[in-house]
């Protein structure tokens, strides 16, 4: 039997769920009782990352069930509207609802390395295009179709987006700029949906010990500077269960701040604040015309 919890009876769709933060979020939502639809491009017959074994959708569903939850998986490229629409129509035919959408699909690093000292004008132009498509554009496609087919008619739902603070001072140009596009999308959607009963919140974790990070970065470099992706996953489960989640709508909120608010700890019992001092508070969308003071 699936886990019972604050999200029992609700359906969550998590994109980019084959590894890292997406997998951890799927597991934590399932542990809180949600039925989780896991999507990504990587399956056991074709994975985008092979440096670590079983970073696949099947592996994620195994982890969901090991946590006492249940769900299903579907291969989907979230930059392709036809694929996303077919996915959503299938989910709605089978389950009749989508209560929580987690926009976590990325892929911006699939073929690009982080800047390493070259001049700004020497960074490959293709990086920015890939990051915009894999980030803000895939978020836009998936969110609009979910609103159109599910949350809009229901006048309820929660859209969560995983992101990165735009730090001060700015760092890697294509990465920072593409994340800023994601964040502004959340702000704009939050503004326009605030009277529809649909929340839109971006969560910004610190430096995470994902499977690929642990495979490629020395343990002594990660020690004391990182958090597990389950901290952000637990925070998103708490947001999904919060009847007052609209207080955060349209904002980019730090995972450490949310962990303090909901009194949530990481897997090891710590509560990291990896972003402290490196970002500005997110702006709050203004009231719609004729509303508020």
PLM region descriptions:
Residues 1-95, 107-119, 126, 290:
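Short-chain dehydrogenase/reductase
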Residues 102, 160, 200-203, 213:
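Hydrophobic structural elements of the Rossmann-like NAD(P)H-binding subdomain
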Residues 29, 97, 183, 193-208, ...:
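Conserved Rossmann-fold SDR core element
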Residues 10, 69-70, 97-98, 150-163, ...:
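Active-site loop of short-chain dehydrogenase/reductase
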Residues 202, 219-293:
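C-terminal helical subdomain
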Residues 48-53, 116, 195, 205-227, ...:
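A glycine/serine/threonine-rich, flexible loop-to-helix segment
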């Amino acid at each position: 039997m699936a886990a019972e919890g604050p999200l029992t009876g609700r359906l969550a769709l998590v994109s980019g769920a084959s590894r890292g933060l997406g997998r951890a979020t799927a597991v934590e939502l399932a542990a809180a009782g949600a039925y989780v639809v896991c999507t990504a491009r990587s399956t056991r017959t074709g994975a985008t990352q092979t440096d670590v074994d079983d970073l696949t959708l099947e592996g994620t569903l195994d982890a969901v069930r090991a946590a006492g939850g249940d769900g299903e998986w579907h291969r989907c490229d979230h930059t392709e509207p036809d694929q996303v629409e077919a996915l959503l129509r299938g989910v709605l035919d089978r389950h009749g609802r989508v209560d929580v959408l987690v926009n976590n699909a990325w892929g911006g690093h699939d073929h690009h390395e982080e800047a390493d000292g070259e001049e700004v004008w020497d960074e490959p132009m293709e990086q920015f295009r890939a990051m915009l498509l894999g980030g803000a554009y895939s978020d836009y496609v998936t969110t609009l179709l979910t609103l159109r087919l599910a949350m809009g008619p229901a006048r309820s739902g929660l859209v969560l987006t995983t992101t990165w603070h735009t730090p001060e001072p700015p760092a890697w140009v294509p990465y920072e700029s593409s994340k800023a596009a994601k964040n502004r999308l959340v702000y704009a959607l939050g503004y326009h949906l605030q009277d529809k009963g649909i929340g839109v919140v971006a969560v910004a974790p610190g430096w995470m010990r994902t499977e690929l990070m642990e495979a490629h970065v020395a343990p002594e470099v990660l020690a004391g500077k990182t958090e597990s992706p389950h901290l952000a996953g637990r925070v998103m489960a708490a947001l999904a269960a919060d009847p007052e989640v609209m207080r955060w709508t349209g904002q980019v909120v730090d995972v450490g701040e949310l962990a303090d608010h909901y009194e949530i700890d990481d897997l090891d019992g710590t509560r990291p604040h990896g972003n402290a001092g490196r970002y500005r508070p997110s702006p709050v969308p203004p009231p719609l015309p004729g509303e508020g003071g």
